[in-house]
Regions:
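Compositionally biased, non-globular sequence tracts
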Residues: 2-4, 13-127, 136-205
């Protein structure tokens, strides 16, 4: 399965925030996805093992975790998180809040655009060929989240924000003590631009 087949577009400042946190943004995000996939697979197996043991039609279980996960995913009584939410009373709607924030769109009539983010300013592409997951890995995650792309965008935004906070925490006091600075930007994005333009800026990642 390939998600984000056209890549993920971010701004140069968002890229800088990522690179202030890690040396390779794509590798870090991919590593995070891999770790999350394993944790979701482990959770799925832990949740379902008692049910499998109680099912008289199950005479043996695979010793391999991936094969065991595939057995669970193939069962008639297995439901994805989206299917469970749709069957709830009342049904739980599809949540793509992270995507909405990232794209600067609205959800249910509420503006969710982040003040500093203008999607049209995005000029950097991450994962230009998309992110590839095996069907089993994707389905293990979908046991617990409604939408894969919304989940990945949430993780990406989290890393960007951590890098931004780390950068600001280090350089804001330096700027405030700099007599040559006569005015401060009114937005975080403007502050990031100011920090990146400084001759004493050193990338943290």
């Amino acid at each position: 399965m390939i998600i984000f087949s056209d890549g993920i577009q971010i701004t140069t400042n968002e890229q800088a925030c990522l690179l202030h946190l890690v040396s390779d943004a794509e590798a870090s995000i991919q590593r995070g996805i891999t770790e999350k996939v394993k944790s979701r697979r482990d959770a799925l197996i832990e949740e379902w093992r008692p049910r499998l043991h109680a099912d008289s039609s199950v005479t043996e279980l695979p010793a391999d975790d991936i094969a065991l996960a595939e057995l669970i995913l193939a069962r008639d009584d297995y439901k994805t998180r989206l299917q469970q939410d749709a069957a709830a009373d009342p049904p739980v709607p599809l949540d793509q809040h992270n995507i909405a924030k990232f794209e600067g769109t609205s959800r249910a009539g509420k503006t969710v655009k982040r003040p500093d983010r203008v999607p049209g300013d995005a000029t950097v592409t991450l994962f230009a060929s998309g992110i590839t997951l095996t069907d089993t890995d994707a389905n293990c995650v979908l046991a617990y989240v409604q939408d894969l792309e919304n989940w990945v965008i949430g993780a990406l935004m989290g890393q960007i924000n951590r890098g931004k906070k780390k950068m600001i925490a280090k350089y804001h006091p330096i700027i405030m003590d700099d007599d040559s600075v006569s005015a401060m930007p009114g937005t975080e994005d403007g502050l990031i631009t100011m920090i990146l333009a400084r001759s004493d800026y050193v990338r943290g990642g």
